[in-house]
């Protein structure tokens, strides 16, 4: 909310209000002069003349980019056609944006009963939720080298083959509401003599403790 007061001694003519904001932080900026009717903001607002003793209130609203964290600074400037106008023509406000994210990981196996020499196919789905994007998402899945041929294990991300699986993968930013699917293939060793239990852990900036899911192959 921006309030412009004219304390005199003369009418403030041709008053123009400009809102300075970072387009990487805010989008869809709108303004209202009565709190009910909203208009898209386009570079400046022409407020016309403001009489002595009068004030004008301008309301602003905008959506915050889901990747934004921390302080968001917003500045407004006003100009007038009065040559010798005096007063405060700039004001700013800082709002602290706190992340609101959820991160869910689900792990499954295409076939849960295999024999030595068969290939395990793990399917891992990571879903980001909340009002903020999940940042610096990392998936870790350490295969059991006593039961699986870890050196020949391969993986794919969203259906695209990526090569040899090394145990961890940086998924970067996952936009809220989106999912990433990671497939891992590994051959069961001929010497395998027990169930293959496997655990996946997914962390992010907001959830450093991680979320886990597991699958067991018999």
Residue map of PLM features:
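Exported/extracytosolic protein signature
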Residues: 1-218
């Amino acid at each position: 909310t921006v309030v412009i007061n004219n304390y005199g001694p003369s009418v403030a003519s041709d008053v123009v209000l400009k809102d300075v904001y970072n387009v990487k932080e805010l989008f869809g900026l709108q303004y209202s002069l009565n709190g009910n009717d909203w208009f898209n903001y386009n570079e400046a607002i022409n407020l016309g003349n403001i009489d002595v003793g009068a004030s004008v209130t301008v309301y602003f609203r905008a959506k915050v980019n889901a990747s934004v964290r921390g302080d968001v600074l917003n500045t407004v400037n006003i100009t007038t056609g009065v040559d010798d106008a005096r007063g405060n023509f700039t004001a700013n406000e800082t709002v602290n944006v706190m992340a609101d994210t959820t991160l869910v990981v689900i792990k499954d196996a295409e076939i849960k009963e295999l024999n030595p020499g068969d290939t395990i196919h793990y399917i891992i789905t990571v879903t980001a939720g909340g009002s903020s994007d999940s940042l610096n998402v990392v998936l870790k899945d350490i295969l059991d080298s006593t039961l699986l041929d870890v050196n020949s294990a391969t993986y794919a991300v969203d259906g695209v083959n990526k090569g040899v699986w090394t145990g961890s993968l940086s998924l970067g930013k996952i936009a809220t509401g989106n999912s990433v699917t990671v497939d891992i293939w590994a051959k069961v060793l001929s010497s395998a003599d027990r169930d293959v239990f496997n655990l996946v852990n997914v962390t992010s900036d907001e959830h450093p403790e991680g979320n886990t899911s597991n699958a067991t192959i018999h």
